[in-house]
């Protein structure tokens, strides 16, 4: 685990799933269940490789690989239903959450930049009673281009009214890491609540 000096940053943009919350096992389980209902076995790595991507785009990727997904809309809706049935069990990653609280205490602006739906973000923040710590939410519902496109992070900077050099992204998934690079923002790469490396813009 590396040590990071967060003092230069005035804006913090946190990915949600796999970064701030340990939700990926819950997402994978939901995806696998829907796949099973469509008579095929889904490799967990397929989902982990697409961390940060929208559910819609993940289903399109499944379709491209020849999987029977039926209605894309219904497939996504069923996955969301299964995930949300267990959302109150999803824990926070403590080290990443500490970065958030310490940044907030010194007056930095806090945004969540995620490929998940807004309702999931709102529920997670309420479940853990941390809604008051987050200034802005940029969800899958708020953008037209999803990670690895930089729109999520560009919108976060716009809302925070800060330039890239004053911001940092905290991310675990390759699409989000690529999005941060495209937005010219420093990116702290995390894995299972460990700080792996700091990618400079």
What are these regions (language model features)?
Residues 26, 50-54, 91-95, 116, ...:
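Short beta->alpha linker loops
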Residues 1-10, 101-104, 117-201:
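Asp-based, Mg2+/Mn2+-dependent phosphohydrolase catalytic module
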Residues 30, 58, 95, 120-123, ...:
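Phosphate- and divalent-cation-binding pockets in alpha/beta enzyme and binding domains
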């Amino acid at each position: 685990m590396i040590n990071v000096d967060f003092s230069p940053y005035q804006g913090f943009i946190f990915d949600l799933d796999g970064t701030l919350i340990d939700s990926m096992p819950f997402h994978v389980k939901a995806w696998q269940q829907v796949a099973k209902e469509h008579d095929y076995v889904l490799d967990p790595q397929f989902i982990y490789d697409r961390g940060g991507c929208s559910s819609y785009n993940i289903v399109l990727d499944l379709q491209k690989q020849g999987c029977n997904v039926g209605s894309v809309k219904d497939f996504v809706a069923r996955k969301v239903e299964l995930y949300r049935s267990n959302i109150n069990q999803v824990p926070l990653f403590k080290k990443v959450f500490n970065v958030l609280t310490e940044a907030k205490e010194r007056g930095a602006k806090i945004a969540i930049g995620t490929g998940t739906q807004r309702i999931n973000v709102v529920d997670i923040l309420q479940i853990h009673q941390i809604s008051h710590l987050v200034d802005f939410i940029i969800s899958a519902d708020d953008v037209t281009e999803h990670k690895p496109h930089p729109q999520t992070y560009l919108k976060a900077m716009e809302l925070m009214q800060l330039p890239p050099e004053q911001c940092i992204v905290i991310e675990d998934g390759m699409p989000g890491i690529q999005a941060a690079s495209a937005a010219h923002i420093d990116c702290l790469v995390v894995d299972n609540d460990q700080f792996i490396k700091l990618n400079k813009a």
